[in-house]
């Protein structure tokens, strides 16, 4: 699904791309956590959260040294196989893992713009698959844009973008406030609520 924000992301610096991605991953995290809770996968929840915490740490702690190749290996061990589960919950859980993998690849390879667009698309794609599963039909791009859940996700992405665009330099307080706001709200891109 095309999103006008993708063109605008070109105007941001790499730390802004990474913060945008981390915010979207944080919003997808409840989908993975609920899936883990339903399937008694408590270690996997911890691993996912630890990796996401390290991404935020990388963005907010000066000169921090984190081996993200190692974190990517850990993440790969907890990515669910859709063929092993009957419930729909595995799909948004898988998307949450894929988004987190994209941000790790972005940090490792330094390709932040492409990955920011990719995570934006993954998050919108999770909503699309849910809508198509619930209604049993394909949704055209024009119909998707009229959908309330899609509009909410687009609004959130624009809000994060606008916050970051206004920063002239890396603003640690803003990054932490963004993380805390999304985490405290505890509501995912598909409306899953998960509070620790």
Swiss-Prot record:
Pfam family, one: DUF416
Top-rank lineage group of the source organism: Bacteria
Listed InterPro entries: DUF416, YP001051499.1-like_dom_sf
Family statement: To E.coli YjaG.
Protein name according to UniProt: Uncharacterized protein HI_0431
Organism whose genome encodes this protein: Haemophilus influenzae (strain ATCC 51907 / DSM 11121 / KW20 / Rd)
